[in-house]
Regions:
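Catalytic cores of DNA base-excision repair glycosylases
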Residues: 1-170
Length: 170
């Protein structure tokens, strides 16, 4: 993984103590911001995106993080996955963000098969009722972290093995 959620939470806790708004964020130089986020990897690109997105939030959205997927995706460094996470977590919207865990578990179970995150997201949207998208996203991540590991999935102890395409085709 580029950076674990645990690492992101530690880094943002320190960063947001002093820079918790776009207005405060843009007072940092890119080099200063890089020092805060260095441990997350790809810090040079991420710092440039954070500063650009902060400026856009101020200039285009009056200092407020946009609350639609379409507007979120106009921000530098914000793709489909990040927009879905922000939309679901910050605004309570129904969204499925396809990370490595969601991608793997969805394909293995046969819920949504695809070679790209976009195809898997589309398949999950079709297979799961919209009001459950955000919960399903979290359940799939949890299952991928705890049971359905990328290298050695714990199929024997998996409660979903009877329904799992991967397990049943071994």
């Amino acid at each position: 993984a580029q950076c674990t959620d645990e690492r992101v939470n530690k880094v943002t806790a320190v960063l947001f103590k002093n820079y918790d708004t776009p207005e405060k964020m843009i007072t940092l130089t890119q080099e200063e911001l890089e020092k805060y986020i260095f441990s997350c990897g790809f810090y040079h690109n991420k710092s440039a995106h954070i500063l650009s997105a902060s400026r856009d939030i101020i200039e285009k959205f009056g200092g407020e993080v946009p609350d639609s997927l379409e507007k979120l995706r106009t921000l530098a460094g914000v793709g489909r996955k990040t927009a879905n996470v922000v939309y679901a977590v910050a605004f309570g919207g129904n969204a499925i963000a396809v990370d490595t865990h969601v991608f793997r578990v969805s394909n293995r179970l046969g819920i949504a098969e695809g070679k790209t995150p976009e195809k898997v997201e589309d398949g999950l949207r079709e297979a799961i009722p919209e009001e459950l998208w955000s919960k399903a996203h979290h359940y799939l991540i949890y299952h991928g972290r705890r049971v359905c590991h990328s290298q050695k999935p714990d199929c024997i102890n998996c409660t979903l093995k009877d329904y799992c395409k991967y397990f049943n085709n071994k």
